[in-house]
Amino acid sequence: MIRDGDVLLFQGDSITNAFRMPNEINDAYRLGAGYVFLIAARLRALRPHAGIRIENRGVSGDSLSRLRARWHEDCLAIRPTLLSILVGINNTAAGVDLEADARDAEAFEQEYDDLLVLTRKSLPKVRFVLCEPFLLPAGEVTDDRIRAIALRQGAVRRLAARHHAVFVPFQRVLADA
């Protein structure tokens, strides 16, 4: 999946951001203290001469719309060969009625699809990794919130299939942990 010379770009919200300090040179700060740094550390340990470039452009609080607003500068200009996206939790509107939330989830799926189509058009050889948004049993996790995120999880799963992307089922993995 990861090839020598690849440019890996991680996009998403606070989970991806993980307190990154983008102006730092050292990966321990530049990539944040989360999964992006762990992946980078492992790759560099296992393949130190592979020439793999790793970038983190996660922004805390990002929704899909905010991600899209910065897409040209924070994705297309970087020209990734492998693009990982984790977004969706900040697109949930827990506490709204089921019909409204279903409409919001449909709009989320369409906007996400448009973003992937735009990316593929600009970067025909890019490979996608689509990560499922997830909820942890922390804070107030209501049935409405679970339902809202489940709609977006289904959307990301469908998009991964449609765009021949790797799908990362975070919710199941975390539930099984």
Label each PLM-derived region with a short phrase.
Residues 2-4, 33, 38-53, 62, ...:
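Alpha-helical cap/lid subdomain in secreted, periplasmic
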Residues 2-29:
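Short glycine-rich His-centered loop
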Residues 10-11, 56, 130:
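A structural signal for the hydrophobic beta-strands that form the central parallel beta-sheet
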